[in-house]
């Protein structure tokens, strides 16, 4: 019964992506069923077409790509032909674009020259994030249903040897104001699949993400999307098979709509982590997550906030002591299967010592959170618990609501861990504290 539902849901999303190839200039009309927090600007029509040349012999095609972009910038369409493979071995800064479409019908493949990419990929100034390219400007669309391949296997193996290497992100959407991304197939990213930074009014529609390691070395940190310092973003109608957050709202993400996603193998749809860097102010507000299927994952709804004292999860992930707020966050309608936590809210992220976390509570507040209409079954890994809502102090969490949460463990239990939170606002079975 579950398998039938999963297959029908996934195939439905893929069908949505396929029909999106009839590209719509009206981004607002393309959004549904929910509409974005603010109207998305309409894309202008294009009046010329440029086809990208390819060497066809494994040689770097970056010069051909830049030539076509310059030729068709300001009102044109650049086509990556269906029967061609395009090799990118050069870091491309494409933030100069305006009123242009990139129609990807063929395959774009990044080289596996790890020394070059570590030295030349674009450093984004957040959590060691680097990108193969930077796509930005104004009214830029990238669609067509073709494939973008990050050649990730060499990076998965290298990261197993040295977890401080700089692994490029497949899609760097940097400084884009007005754009549509998708439909596209994204494969084998070395790290995140999307890093959306300093951008606004962007629609992601019909993205098919997949790429697992073919060796014993896992593909790690392969988030589907990370938004950062970005506003009015829509992510919808997509299928994500990965090994980390399906979507993650990083610092200063505002007015974000996520809807109609099928996530498999992920760490959930996450706010944060936030408060990682001392003396920095992180804000995430006005986020609506709707109609999600989450399978074989660690979490569904997740809010991750660092405590007020420094702590460390690993050599490349440590911090705590930052301030800010999480406000007006809604998770509405989710089907889960084999997920460890249906809901996980913590202000002790990275700190295993709960006593120390409570002694130095987070300076980042969580308020006005609504989680509703969840159904399904957990993995049972946390039996008898199916969720956890743990704040570091009652003064730093307020107005957290849950309703219609019909989630059980395989054994039929539905217990929650609740700490420093107003249980009268929760419709769940709080039976334990984090102590």
Curated annotation (Swiss-Prot):
Domain of life: Eukaryota
Active-site residue numbers: 244, 267
Alphabetized UniProt keyword annotations: Cell wall biogenesis/degradation, Disulfide bond, Glycoprotein, Glycosidase, Hydrolase, Repeat, Secreted, Signal
Presence of keyword Glycoprotein: yes
Feature: compositional bias, Basic and acidic residues: 45-55
Disordered as annotated region, ranges: 32-55
Signal peptide start-end: 1-22
Ranges: PbH1 repeats: 199-229, 230-251, 253-273, 326-347, 361-409
Sequence intervals crossing the membrane: none
Disulfide-bonded cysteines: 246-263, 391-397
Annotated GO MF terms: galacturan 1,4-alpha-galacturonidase activity; polygalacturonase activity
InterPro entries: Glyco_hydro_28, Pectin_lyas_fold, Pectin_lyase_fold/virulence
Catalytic reactions of this protein: [(1->4)-alpha-D-galacturonosyl](n) + H2O = alpha-D-galacturonate + [(1->4)-alpha-D-galacturonosyl](n-1)
Protein name: Exopolygalacturonase X
Organismal lineage: Eukaryota, Fungi, Dikarya, Ascomycota, Pezizomycotina
């Amino acid at each position: 019964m579950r398998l039938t539902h999963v297959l029908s849901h996934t195939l439905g999303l893929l069908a949505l992506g396929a029909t999106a190839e009839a590209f719509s200039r009206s981004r607002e009309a393309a959004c549904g069923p929910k509409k974005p927090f603010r109207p998305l600007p309409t894309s202008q029509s294009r009046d010329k077409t440029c086809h990208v040349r390819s060497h066809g012999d494994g040689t770097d095609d970056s010069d051909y790509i830049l030539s076509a972009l310059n030729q068709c910038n300001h009102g044109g369409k650049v086509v990556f032909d269906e029967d061609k493979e395009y090799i990118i071995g050069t870091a491309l800064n494409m933030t100069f674009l305006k009123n242009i479409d990139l129609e990807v019908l063929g395959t774009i493949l990044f080289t596996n020259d790890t020394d070059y990419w570590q030295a030349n990929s674009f450093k984004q100034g957040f959590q060691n994030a680097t990108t193969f390219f930077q796509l930005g400007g104004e009214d830029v669309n990238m669609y067509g249903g073709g494939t973008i391949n990050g050649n990730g296997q060499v990076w998965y193996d290298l990261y197993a040897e040295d977890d401080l290497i700089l692994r490029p992100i497949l899609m760097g959407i940097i400084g884009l104001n007005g754009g549509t991304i998708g439909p596209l197939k994204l494969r084998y990213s070395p790290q995140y699949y999307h890093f959306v930074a300093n951008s606004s009014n962007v629609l992601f529609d019909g993205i098919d993400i997949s790429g697992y390691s073919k060796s014993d070395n896992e593909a790690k940190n392969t988030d589907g999307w990370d938004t950062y310092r970005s506003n009015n973003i829509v992510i919808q109608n997509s299928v994500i098979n990965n090994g980390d957050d399906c979507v993650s709202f990083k610092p200063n993400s505002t007015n974000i709509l996520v809807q109609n996603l099928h996530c498999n193998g992920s760490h959930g749809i996450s706010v944060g982590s936030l408060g990682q860097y001392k003396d920095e102010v992180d804000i995430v507000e006005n986020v609506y997550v709707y109609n999600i299927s989450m399978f074989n994952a660690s979490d569904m709804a997740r809010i991750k906030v660092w405590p007020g004292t420094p702590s460390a999860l690993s050599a490349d992930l440590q911090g705590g002591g930052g301030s800010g707020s999480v406000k007006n966050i809604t998770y509405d309608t989710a089907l889960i299967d084999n997920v460890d936590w249906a809901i996980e809210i913590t202000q002790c992220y990275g700190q295993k010592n709960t006593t120390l976390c409570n002694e130095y509570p987070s300076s980042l507040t969580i308020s006005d959170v609504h989680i509703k209409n969840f159904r399904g079954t957990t993995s049972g890994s946390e039996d008898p618990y199916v969720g956890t809502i743990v704040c570091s102090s009652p003064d730093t969490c307020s107005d957290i609501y849950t309703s219609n949460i019909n989630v059980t463990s395989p054994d039929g239990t539905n217990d929650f861990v609740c700490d420093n939170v107003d249980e009268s606002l929760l419709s769940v079975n709080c039976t334990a504290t984090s102590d």
